[in-house]
Amino acid sequence: MKVIEKVEAIKQQEITATENLEQMYSTIEEKNDDINAFVQLDIEKARKTAEDIDKRIKNNEETGKLAGLVIGIKSNINVEDFIISAASPTLKNYYGSYNATVINRILDEDGVIIGLTNMDEFAAGSSTETSMYGPTNNPKAPGHIPGGSSGGSAAAIAANMCDITLGSDTGGSIRNPASHCGVMGFKPTYGMVSRQGLLDLAMSLDQIGPFANDTTGIGLMLNVICGYDPYDTTTINKQPEDFLKDTTNSTLEGQTIGVVKEFMDITDDKITSQINKSIDDMTSLGAEIKELSFEDINLGLPTYYLINYVEFFSATRKYDGRKYGERIEEVCGAEVARRIEIGSYISQKEFSGKYYNKALQARSLIRNEFNELLNDVDVIAGPTVPKLPHKIGEEIETMDMYAYDVLTVLANITGIPASSMNSGLVDNIPVGLQLQAKPEDDHKILSTMSALENN
């Protein structure tokens, strides 16, 4: 049953919100000890919400777009009365005193928030191994990482623990785990979704987005969370369109799909072979394939990390142990410490022009060149991650870990929308097809996903 079909079934009283919740909770109880997707639950509060929805439906009262759907939230998004730790001992006792804008919008539409999902500490990672709660296990490839930093949110969907989850994406943190876990993940255009209430990693790169098992779940959640927010001045001040319409009767007839040569060249051969099958599927559905070249791909990771380091260093200065929590440098893990140290170095006045300003110049160059590529096509398609996920606990060099994001950081640098959906299996492990489009062309990506999903 697709997500939108479940909402209709709940509203038509074919199933109840309470039944849906209890089924999901039973799955969590059965699987979470092994998977560690959820790090915090409030089942009693969720039950009260579900019971209220059922009562209103029974009384023929109006209910919201998400009526009765079970929702999981990444642990760096403020939800009142939950511990918003960002999986770090720095904030292990910090209770959210307010709801992020996206949370209020979910609750206003009768979503049932069941709990918070695991993640890399402060979203600084690509494996969900750096969490103070321990690593998350990949439900689709047991023993392997689920990707990160939103690994718990992806794993929860892959294990059918909830209907939709939210994650945040700084350089691939939604798309990377969506690829490894074989689910759908969507990073909207920068500014399409409010970041108010997000404990951000890098403010100019971060974006909140959904995970689901089908495009109706993605479209439904985008309809709820997208839109202008006066509390976040980076949000786009225009009414977003109905994303659900892009999940029905979608076609690739007359569409031009770009394939970037360099994206394929740096990807493992087995993954490239599988991605080519998805591209062949697009051709059979009526799309024209156009080969593109992006020679500045090697600029992506260094540009991204220079910006990331400086913005992360700035964002973490408030965690000084004075108002709440611990001083971050005294309790954080190795990856967070590394980023703080490098960010501090780059931020020193005598170096700011040498590194950070150069990174901003490179960002403008990348944005301009990538947008030129997108002018000639509707969507760019290619692999989400260039290699398969490693095994949990396997020693891996820092730069090899960073390389997981080489194909995803470009969307954050440029602010464009991007998604990942399952392309197939390589060595019995899911690999994702990444789709990217021009800013505010989120609907083109969702329509392409739907055409592939339904055909």
Curated annotation (Swiss-Prot):
Pfam families linked: Amidase
Disulfide-bond pairs as recorded: none
Family the UniProt entry places it in: Belongs to the amidase family. GatA subfamily.
Name the UniProt record assigns to this protein: Glutamyl-tRNA(Gln) amidotransferase subunit A
EC number(s) per entry: 6.3.5.7
Record has Nucleotide-binding as a keyword: yes
HAMAP family: GatA (MF_00120)
PROSITE patterns from the UniProt entry: AMIDASES
Annotated function: Allows the formation of correctly charged Gln-tRNA(Gln) through the transamidation of misacylated Glu-tRNA(Gln) in organisms which lack glutaminyl-tRNA synthetase. The reaction takes place in the presence of glutamine and ATP through an activated gamma-phospho-Glu-tRNA(Gln).
GO biological process: translation
Catalytic activity: L-glutamyl-tRNA(Gln) + L-glutamine + ATP + H2O = L-glutaminyl-tRNA(Gln) + L-glutamate + ADP + phosphate + H(+)
InterPro entries the record matches: Amidase, Amidase_CS, Amidase_dom, AS_sf, GatA
UniProt-annotated catalytic positions: 74 (charge relay system), 149 (charge relay system), 173 (acyl-ester intermediate)
Annotated keywords: ATP-binding, Ligase, Nucleotide-binding, Protein biosynthesis
Quaternary organization: Heterotrimer of A, B and C subunits.
Enzyme class (EC, first level): ligase
Gene: gatA
Any GO MF annotation of the entry: ATP binding
Keyword set includes Nucleotide-binding: yes
GO cellular component, one term: glutamyl-tRNA(Gln) amidotransferase complex
